[in-house]
């Protein structure tokens, strides 16, 4: 089940509300990534404390480890990971296609060697839907081929991107058919592909909308933009985003997959995106790269050795309320696990507060003012 209410707009920016089987999600929203069933360095209680409404799990990795039988014993992924709010799972396609020489793509699906033990495995639209049904995620992603930006060290040609996109469209239909056959009570999202080529993006979206229409408008609960932030220049990412996002069906949520920086999130919301996910805030946190209202901080740098200030005096997260830059610098230098935890709490809090601020700005029809202030604050740099 997915009900989406578009509450108000400000330009192309949208303020919405998704009602899913495990709860309500206020949009626009950022989804922390829990690849193996855990958001790195964070407990479910901590995620709720910083305002996480929905988290993402990885179908491919959870299928391989711990295996579906283990998750079945917990009545699905929510019970296994101890999270009672909504969850989204990807289809596993991106991870399979990232295996390079270890995989072979056919019309039926993808044959590949397990990165864990080398076993020969096969993943198809049907199998992906069956796995995600057993995981019981609130939002299920269609099985697709993520068109790479580069093939053999050069940008993908339009013909290569077209072949990949059309394969994804055929797989979208098969995903939809299997989702229906499984009687999955959750929501299926289609994924717009087409590389850096606007006409191919248009063709992909039209094909997904045809599948949706054939199911009486119930074919897809939402629409995602895939194949961005895969190595392309930033200007190409923004160009494709600004072309596709306004064309997505207005009555369904819009999801920009795998993106990105704080600036990317603001640009995405300005273009009409409702949902984001990215490993950046958690990965950067573990590496000591911290996001603040006034720019980024590399906490390992010597300049922070004796600094008694919090990371961001305007931030209300647990880390900023209780610890100094000097202490976080020390933890990073000596490799203490607590450092990774405190950094992650801060970065995810920053991302989620950024989304909350954008929701408020859209509600008050002051998003343009917010966006200008955001850019000026970030450009100032952390002092």
Curated annotation (Swiss-Prot):
Substrate binds at residues 90-94, 144, 193, 227. It comes from Ralstonia nicotianae (strain ATCC BAA-1114 / GMI1000) (Ralstonia solanacearum). SUPFAM superfamilies: tRNA-guanine transglycosylase. InterPro entries: ArchSynthase1/Queuine_TRR (IPR050076), TGT (IPR004803), TGT-like_sf (IPR036511), tRNA_ribo_trans-like (IPR002616). It holds the Pfam family TGT. Its cofactor is Zn(2+). It catalyses: 7-aminomethyl-7-carbaguanine + guanosine(34) in tRNA = 7-aminomethyl-7-carbaguanosine(34) in tRNA + guanine. Zn(2+) binds at residues 315, 317, 320, 346. This is Queuine tRNA-ribosyltransferase. Residues 258-264, 282-286 are annotated as: RNA binding. GO terms for cellular component: cytosol. Gene3D superfamilies: Queuine tRNA-ribosyltransferase-like. Homodimer. Within each dimer, one monomer is responsible for RNA recognition and catalysis, while the other monomer binds to the replacement base PreQ1. Keywords: Glycosyltransferase, Metal-binding, Queuosine biosynthesis, Transferase, tRNA processing, Zinc.
């Amino acid at each position: 089940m997915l009900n989406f209410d578009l509450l108000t707009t400000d330009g192309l920016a949208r303020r919405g509300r998704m009602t899913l089987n495990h709860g309500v999600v206020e949009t626009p929203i950022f989804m922390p990534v829990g690849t193996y069933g855990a958001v790195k360095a964070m407990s479910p209680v901590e995620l709720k404390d910083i305002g996480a409404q929905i988290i993402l799990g990885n179908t491919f990795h959870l299928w391989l480890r711990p295996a579906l039988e283990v998750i079945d014993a917990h009545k699905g992924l929510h019970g296994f990971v101890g999270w009672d709010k909504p969850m989204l799972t990807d289809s596993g396609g991106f991870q399979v296609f990232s295996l390079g020489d270890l995989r072979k793509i056919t019309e039926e699906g993808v044959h590949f060697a397990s990165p864990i033990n080398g076993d020969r495995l096969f993943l198809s639209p049907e199998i992906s839907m069956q796995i995600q049904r057993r995981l019981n995620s609130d939002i299920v992603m269609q099985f697709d081929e993520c068109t790479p930006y580069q093939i053999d060290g050069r940008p993908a040609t339009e013909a290569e991107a077209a072949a990949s996109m059309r394969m994804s469209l055929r797989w979208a239909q098969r995903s939809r058919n299997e989702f229906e056959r499984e009687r999955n009570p959750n929501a299926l999202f289609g994924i717009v592909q087409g590389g850096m080529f606007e006409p191919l993006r248009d063709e992909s979206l039209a094909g997904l909308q045809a599948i949706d229409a054939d199911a009486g408008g119930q074919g897809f609960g939402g629409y995602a933009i895939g194949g961005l932030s895969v190595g392309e220049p930033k200007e190409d990412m923004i160009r494709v985003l600004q072309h596709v996002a306004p064309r997505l069906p207005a009555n369904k949520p819009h999801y920009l997959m795998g993106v990105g920086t704080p600036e990317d999130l603001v640009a995405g919301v300005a273009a009409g995106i409702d949902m984001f996910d990215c490993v950046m805030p958690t990965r950067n946190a573990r590496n000591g790269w911290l996001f603040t209202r006034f720019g980024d901080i590399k906490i390992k740098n010597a300049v922070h050795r004796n600094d008694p200030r919090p990371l961001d005096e305007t931030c209300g997260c647990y880390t900023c309320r209780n610890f100094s830059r000097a202490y976080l610098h020390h933890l990073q230098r000596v490799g203490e696990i607590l450092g990774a935890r405190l950094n992650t709490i801060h970065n995810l809090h920053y991302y989620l507060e950024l989304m909350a601020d954008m929701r408020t700005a859209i509600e008050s029809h002051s998003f343009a003012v917010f966006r200008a202030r955001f850019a000026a604050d970030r450009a100032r740099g952390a002092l």
